[in-house]
Amino acid sequence: MKTKKATAVLATAIVLALSASACGGSDSKDDNSKGGGAGIDAGLTSVVNKSDKKGGTVTFEHSDVPDSLDPGNTYYGWVQNFSRLYGRTLTSFKPAAGKEGLEVVPDLAESLGESSPDAKTWTYKLRKGVKFDDGSPVTSKDVKYAIERSNFAPEALSHGPTYFKAYLEGGEDYKGPYKDKSPEGLKSIETPDDQTIIFKLNKPFADFDYLATFSQTAPVPQARDKGAEYVQAMASSGPYKFESYNEGRSATLVRNPHWDQATDPIRPALADKITIKFKVNPTTVDQHLMSDNITVDAAGTGLQTKTQPKVLTKATEKAKTDNSYAGATSYLALSTKVKPFDNADCRKAVQYAIDKASVQAALGGDTKGDVASTLLPPTVNGYQKFDLYQTEGNKGDVAKAKAALADCGQPDGFKTNLTARSDRPDEVQMATAIQASLKEVGIQAEIKQYPSGKYFGNFAGVPSYVKEHDLGMMMMAWGADWPTGFGFLDQIVNGSAIKPSGGNNLMELDDPTINKALSDGIAQTDAAARTKAWGEVDKLVMENASVVPLIYRKNLLYRPDSATNVTVTQAYLGMYDYLLIGSTT
């Protein structure tokens, strides 16, 4: 892997090359005018094949189905990115290259939130003139309703996070709009007029502008809501609306005639049409990218391990790649509610047993990520470097693992189940490497595969299913909801995030010390104090030993020649920014 210095030199050279190309005019027809001609990692620091030309079709493919394309019922990072095409949120991340893309900017709101001194009251003013695809005006009441349905109606919408429920006054008692028919709804969200929305919190929340970027703040008119069926005919507040939607198969988006560029400073909306197809074999997705038959792999996690040699060994193909840090960690979740992982020493045995170097190799080597020792990845604010379960060369320590097994009363090892997502070959290969490591210390792990689209809603994210089927170990990959330690940690280690289904705290970790540390940290109005707090929470989690960090993820992204306005966004897990991207086809 290149050193930071070498990468910086390369990035500088790329920027200079792009500047020289731009001076020559934008009508050049040579390869440097195409998405693939800018050079290796060009998309990390610049917008490749920059264009303001409207027209064409941007085509996406995905190896599985989404949890949902409903902005109020999703937790997948790629859907958060994709849904901005049809759903405007109160705030958003700036569509821009490099670190500029981490800046939070107003979207549906006129400006960032106005906070009270104690960070418990947040006020936003909506832009005037924003309309839904049927021509009706977007109001503050539509934003309020969107939050009510997305956070308080698990009987219909179970996939998204529950930050609003946890932090809004009275959130623990409100039953959601499908059960509570009172016209005022949740009283801690006030809408004194059509342009103003006020949030009253039960505790300080200094990251609220980040929370407002979440797709759950995309407005929903109550009259058009059909609960779980809303996804079949969603209202659009963005530049695109759904022309067709075939559940689990495909969708087509076309221009929203009532979208007004004057009200939307962050969306260029270049393409005339956007299509997405689901359940495409992941290797086929790679082939379609490399043959320029599609614009984007929607998952945004990069080329498959078996595809990588085809691009990395050929200079012209390698020049079309961006090896981005994903701001994400792959880890093994150990269920604290499934024996013998209710015993901390049994969890520590797994920490020492796993040969992380072999896991990295199974994933595809350092192109796909670095060996991890913490839950927080280095690119997220609050990261502190430490390793509580260090082994030589990251290859595991059989002796320490067996000693921990003896301490937990399992000297001969034990049997358990290990889950992975069936449509993610790299994850299955990682699980297979883990299985081999565990076998060396007497732990027999049977791999159970489930589809990613149902992984959290039906299997690993359902505590009753986990216990019934003895799913002691679960493969997991997680990226920050927003790029701070709280935005990364809260929904995966806070006890309040445990849900009947669709949960992401797969360990069912509910440690009062960790829960309090998270609450105390987000209440800090001093940024430096917040940053320090997240590293301390990370250490508490690692001391608990229910999370085995495996890899700080990297994506080997590929940009076909027809793609325009291509740049990596760290705000959305190191994938390409879907708001910017266009196509010459």
Model-derived features: positions:
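Ligand-site clamp/hinge motif
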Residues: 224-234, 259-311
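Surface-exposed binding/hinge segments that line
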Residues: 125, 142-144, 149-220, 246
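N-terminal lobe/hinge region of extracytoplasmic solute-binding protein
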Residues: 61-117, 235
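Alpha-helical secondary-structure segments
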Residues: 59, 138-148, 194-204, 238-239, ...
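Detector for C-terminal structural segments
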Residues: 41-42, 246, 353-384, 426-436, ...
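Structural transition elements
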Residues: 240, 367-407, 422-429
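C-terminal motif of bacterial Sec signal peptides marking the signal peptidase cleavage site
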Residues: 19-22
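Gly/Pro-rich hinge or "lid" segments in bacterial periplasmic/extracellular proteins
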Residues: 94-99, 175, 195, 200-269, ...
